[in-house]
Every structure is written in structure tokens, then in C-alpha cells.
UniProtKB/Swiss-Prot annotation:
Swiss-Prot/TrEMBL keywords: Actin-binding, Cell membrane, Cell projection, Cytoplasm, Cytoskeleton, Membrane
Stretches that traverse the bilayer: none
A GO CC term assigned to this protein in UniProt: extrinsic component of cytoplasmic side of plasma membrane
Source superkingdom: Eukaryota
Membrane topology: Peripheral membrane protein
Assigned protein family: Belongs to the actin-binding proteins ADF family.
Source species: Entamoeba histolytica (strain ATCC 30459 / HM-1:IMSS / ABRM)
Protein name listed in UniProt: Actophorin
Annotated gene: ACTO
Amino acid sequence: MAGIQLADEVTSVYNDFKLSHKYRYIVFKMNDGMTEVVVEKTAEKNATYDDFLKDLPEKSARYAVYDLEYDTPEGLRQKIIFYLWTPEGCKIREKMLYSATKATIKQALVGLSAEIQATDAGELNLDEVIAKVKTISK
């Protein structure tokens, strides 16, 4: 399991996301051979959280980063959220590989503010994500 690599595009696309605020979110997946993490999709800045949720498959695991903007009494805040999506319908081996590789991808994606691990859509509720981020950011 430790042999899974990150494609070069993972860090280059993430750097565009982080430094240039070029995308609202990025979805990453493992290639068909389960040997490398690759970029599956990038979404333009005008994409919504609902668009993001629709891009997470019902029966396959994914990693994702989301550029979350939310209001506080002090003004607008912006945080990069890392997601590990392992839905109930995905295969056990796939869940294990994604969980085992999570530390590798997180190490490459510098500047993450929070992590959300979810197995069903209810755990991805935007209000709950924002509440978690606010708690961490205090």
C-alpha cells in the first residue's frame, strides 16, 4: 500500500488553486491501477458547494480540497478544507488504500486548514463543515 505515488499534476494544480485562487475545488482520485493519485476534476471559482457534492461519486472514494469562504463578525474568511470521501458503497480495499495514502497527499498539499472525513452525504453538510472550521480557527 505504501507504493502509491502522487502524479506531478497533483501539486502543480493544487498550487494554482492555493496561490492563484484559480479554482473553487479539486477532486483527486486513484488511477485505475490504484498506483497513483491523479487530478480528476477542477471547478471554476463560481462553482457552488452543491456542485462539489455532485462531483463526489456515490460508490467510489475520493480526496478533495475546497476553497471555503464564510462570514464571521470580523468579516469574510477563506480556508482550504481537505476531504477524504469513502462512501459506504465503495469497496473495502479502496477504502483501505485511500485511508493509507491520506497522509501522503496531505503532506504534499501545504496550507490545509481542516480535514473532513465522510462516509455519507450527511457528514458533508455545509453548515456543519463551517462550524467545524470555526472551532478549529479560534
